[in-house]
A protein has these predicted regions:
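N-terminal small/polar-rich segments of proteins
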Residues: 24-145, 151, 162-212
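Hydrophobic helical h-region of N-terminal Sec-dependent signal peptides
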Residues: 10-16
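Extracellular glycan-recognition regions
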Residues: 150-156
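Bacterial N-terminal signal peptides that target proteins for export
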Residues: 1-10
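N-terminal signal peptide c-region/cleavage motif recognized by signal peptidases
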Residues: 19-23
């Protein structure tokens, strides 16, 4: 059998099957029944809406337009106190972040009830020489961005933070964002070095959102 004949047979089989696949209800009435009850046909509809959970911290896709996508960019926030500032207890603002100045866009969009948010670090930030700075020395301050209420930020810890629970309204839909501003509290004099970094020396924090 050549390819052309095979394709014709396949097309014919599909054509024969189409009425079966696309069949719908039909009803015939004759005589007086054409006036009452008349001919009726029914169609059933189903709309399948997937659960959606979107989390953004830093660089990411737009989320106010409905075009939610994934973006693998990981931002780096850097704190650089001067020698005179080290350990003086005055908080040091960061550099970097998608909003600059150590400020990140944070957003949650969901459609199926309450959302639980937390942050996990492997341990204290290290310098590779045995010295550490605890994540409790990095403070996150949440302020409003576009939503009426700012998205709360988990308090960073040398491990998994306490949960932040976002309570969904009756619609079960959450759209909440904030500007998260990071600061190094600078409460102690520590040995010189680069603590943490881009996914090295426990420098990475993983934020996780979950939804039932």
């Amino acid at each position: 059998m050549n390819k052309l004949v095979g394709l014709k047979i396949l097309a014919g089989a599909v054509a024969l099957a189409l009425p079966l696949l696309a069949s719908a209800e039909s009803n015939v009435q004759t005589g007086a029944a054409t006036a009452a009850p008349g001919a009726t046909a029914h169609v059933d509809f189903t709309i399948v809406i997937p659960k959606i959970l979107y989390l953004r911290v830093g660089t990411g896709s737009a989320y106010t337009t409905g075009a939610l996508t994934s973006n693998g960019t990981v931002d780096l926030i850097t704190f650089s106190p001067t020698p005179a500032q080290v350990g003086n207890g005055v908080a040091i603002p960061g550099t970097g972040g998608d909003l600059a100045g150590g400020v990140e866009t944070a957003a949650v969009v969901s459609n199926s009830g309450n959302v639980t948010l937390n942050a996990t670090a492997t341990g204290a930030l290290g310098d590779g020489a045995g010295d550490t700075i605890p994540f409790t020395e990095i403070k996150t301050t949440a302020t409003t961005l576009t939503s009426a209420t700012a998205l709360p930020a988990p308090v960073l810890a040398n491990g998994t933070s306490a949960n932040v629970v976002l309570i969904a309204p009756a619609t079960k839909v959450i759209v909440q964002d904030a500007k998260w501003t990071y600061a190094y509290l600078n409460n102690a004099v520590v040995p010189g070095g680069n603590y943490g970094g881009a996914n090295v020396n426990n420098g990475r924090v993983v934020y996780t959102a979950t939804m039932p």
